[in-house]
Regions:
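Intrinsically disordered, low-complexity regulatory regions in eukaryotic proteins
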Residues: 1-102
Length: 102
Protein backbone atom coordinates (compact mmCIF):
# COMPACT_ATOMS: atom_id res chain seq x y z
CA UNK A 1 0.00 0.00 0.00
CA UNK A 2 1.25 3.48 -0.83
CA UNK A 3 2.54 5.58 2.06
CA UNK A 4 1.20 8.81 0.53
CA UNK A 5 4.22 10.82 1.63
CA UNK A 6 3.35 14.35 2.78
CA UNK A 7 5.90 16.50 0.92
CA UNK A 8 8.11 16.80 -2.15
CA UNK A 9 11.45 15.22 -1.35
CA UNK A 10 13.30 18.00 -3.19
CA UNK A 11 11.57 21.32 -2.37
CA UNK A 12 9.57 20.13 0.65
CA UNK A 13 6.29 21.46 -0.80
CA UNK A 14 3.27 20.10 1.05
CA UNK A 15 1.52 17.37 -0.95
CA UNK A 16 -1.71 16.39 0.83
CA UNK A 17 -3.13 12.95 0.11
CA UNK A 18 -5.54 14.45 -2.44
CA UNK A 19 -2.92 16.55 -4.25
CA UNK A 20 -3.02 16.51 -8.03
CA UNK A 21 0.59 17.78 -8.04
CA UNK A 22 2.17 14.71 -6.41
CA UNK A 23 4.29 12.43 -8.59
CA UNK A 24 5.81 9.07 -7.63
CA UNK A 25 8.21 6.59 -9.16
CA UNK A 26 7.80 2.83 -8.84
CA UNK A 27 9.58 2.93 -5.46
CA UNK A 28 7.26 5.71 -4.28
CA UNK A 29 9.90 8.41 -4.12
CA UNK A 30 7.65 11.46 -4.05
CA UNK A 31 8.15 14.81 -5.76
CA UNK A 32 5.91 17.67 -6.88
CA UNK A 33 5.14 18.06 -10.57
CA UNK A 34 7.20 21.27 -10.75
CA UNK A 35 10.36 19.54 -9.50
CA UNK A 36 9.76 16.49 -11.71
CA UNK A 37 9.46 18.69 -14.79
CA UNK A 38 11.94 21.49 -14.09
CA UNK A 39 14.62 19.92 -11.88
CA UNK A 40 14.53 16.17 -12.47
CA UNK A 41 13.52 15.96 -16.13
CA UNK A 42 11.27 12.98 -15.32
CA UNK A 43 14.25 10.93 -14.11
CA UNK A 44 14.06 9.75 -10.52
CA UNK A 45 17.32 10.67 -8.76
CA UNK A 46 17.09 7.52 -6.65
CA UNK A 47 16.22 4.78 -9.14
CA UNK A 48 16.39 6.29 -12.64
CA UNK A 49 12.76 5.52 -13.41
CA UNK A 50 10.09 7.93 -14.52
CA UNK A 51 7.22 9.46 -12.59
CA UNK A 52 3.44 9.12 -12.71
CA UNK A 53 0.65 11.00 -10.90
CA UNK A 54 0.16 9.61 -7.41
CA UNK A 55 -3.23 7.92 -6.97
CA UNK A 56 -5.71 9.53 -4.59
CA UNK A 57 -6.98 7.28 -1.81
CA UNK A 58 -10.74 7.57 -1.24
CA UNK A 59 -11.73 9.75 1.71
CA UNK A 60 -14.93 7.75 2.30
CA UNK A 61 -15.37 4.09 3.12
CA UNK A 62 -17.09 3.05 -0.08
CA UNK A 63 -16.16 -0.62 0.37
CA UNK A 64 -14.15 -2.87 2.66
CA UNK A 65 -12.45 -0.22 4.84
CA UNK A 66 -10.25 0.81 1.92
CA UNK A 67 -10.09 4.54 2.65
CA UNK A 68 -8.08 7.27 4.39
CA UNK A 69 -9.80 6.71 7.73
CA UNK A 70 -8.45 3.15 7.88
CA UNK A 71 -5.14 3.78 6.10
CA UNK A 72 -4.09 7.40 6.69
CA UNK A 73 -1.26 9.07 4.77
CA UNK A 74 2.25 9.11 6.17
CA UNK A 75 3.32 12.06 8.30
CA UNK A 76 7.03 11.28 7.96
CA UNK A 77 8.77 13.97 5.91
CA UNK A 78 11.64 12.85 3.67
CA UNK A 79 13.33 16.07 2.60
CA UNK A 80 16.40 15.17 0.55
CA UNK A 81 17.14 17.98 -1.91
CA UNK A 82 18.72 16.82 -5.15
CA UNK A 83 22.14 18.17 -6.14
CA UNK A 84 21.43 19.54 -9.64
CA UNK A 85 24.98 18.91 -10.93
CA UNK A 86 25.07 15.34 -9.64
CA UNK A 87 21.60 14.68 -11.06
CA UNK A 88 22.54 16.09 -14.46
CA UNK A 89 25.52 13.73 -14.60
CA UNK A 90 23.44 10.76 -13.42
CA UNK A 91 20.49 11.41 -15.74
CA UNK A 92 22.44 12.36 -18.89
CA UNK A 93 22.77 8.82 -20.31
CA UNK A 94 19.15 7.84 -19.59
CA UNK A 95 17.00 10.98 -19.80
CA UNK A 96 16.18 10.45 -23.48
CA UNK A 97 15.16 6.83 -22.96
CA UNK A 98 11.38 6.60 -22.42
CA UNK A 99 10.63 5.59 -18.81
CA UNK A 100 8.93 2.37 -19.92
CA UNK A 101 12.19 1.29 -21.61
CA UNK A 102 14.58 2.17 -18.77
Amino acid sequence: MLELRPTCEHCNKTLPSDSLEARICTYEYTFCVTCVDSVLGNVCPNCGGGFVPRPIRPSKNWKGDNFLGKDPPSTKIKHRPVDPAAHAKFSAPIKNIPPQKR
